[in-house]
Amino acid sequence: MSLFDDNPGPREEVGDSQDLADASESPSADALSPLASDPISCVAIHPGAAHPLASHLPEDLRITWSWPHLLLFVVYAVVSQFAIGIAVLAYYSTNGHLSQRQIRRLFESDPRLIVGTNVLWFGLIILFLYVTLSVLPCLPFWRSLGWKRLDANPLTGKGRPWMYFLSGSGLSLFVIGASSRVKNAEHVPIQEMFKSRSGAMLLLCMAVLVAPMVEETVFRGYLYPVFAGIASRLAQSFGMDSPSAIRAGVVTSILVTGALFGLMHAPQLGWTWGLVGLLILVGIIFTFARAWTGTVFASFLLHLGYNSMLAFLTVLGTKGFTYMPPHR
């Protein structure tokens, strides 16, 4: 399974000449219609009933899933996170003989537990997407979720990969400067992780090695195109022509996906709305890069540069994890 599979395997051949004729008359239908082997996609888009908007959609928005799969994904994400919490609670209650209050404190302050449960949850989410979007319909996983090569073209404003990485690093410096003006920004829950050397190291490893790929796959690879498609169809239902409806859908999805990205981090920030607002802005910028370039790789590089700069400054500020912030 290649990260940049620009030559996906052939789709299932159509059985009779009439179907072949129909496919030739409507080339976009093949790109959007689900395969019979994927029951989730079959519920999402009925075969042979391609939406009139389909022929106008850019290639990176032609996906095999729609709102039914999105609903199933949300349910799965919530249930899996709840199941992980129940499993941890049962383990510590039985083997650790801890009270619920002590366990709750562990969830808030134990870096190994916090990072471990988050990585496990990320893994379960990627597994769900892999099975339902790649294994069942026999499609390339990464390409289906928008991971394609980044074609640099200065004439169209699409830079080289290192430009996105450095832009993400610069964005993190802006956010750090803006955060310094937010009241009580230093008392948010995530700061608890930086009171110990192990906590800071685990968090930064996850932030650089895990979070950019997983979060970009979910937000910019999975959520962005489905929200854009739904919003485009809704806009067209209100009388917009197809190109205008698609533009409206893309803008709406950029804003919605960015807002969800910021809100997902809100508990870590103690729902400090100044900080949450900055993360929403960051999410919007990441999604705009994905929409502009047509590939998740661009937003991934922004995200990687952003988190890498934060990690570098943390290592610098703690003198290589030899000086940790005092407990308050």
Put a short name on every predicted segment:
Residues M1-G159, L173-S180, G305-R328:
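N-terminal, membrane-interfacial amphipathic/helix-forming hydrophobic leader that caps
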Residues F82, S172-R328:
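Transmembrane helix-loop-helix hairpins at the membrane interface
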Residues L155-S167, L171, A211:
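Alpha-helical transmembrane segments of multi-pass membrane proteins
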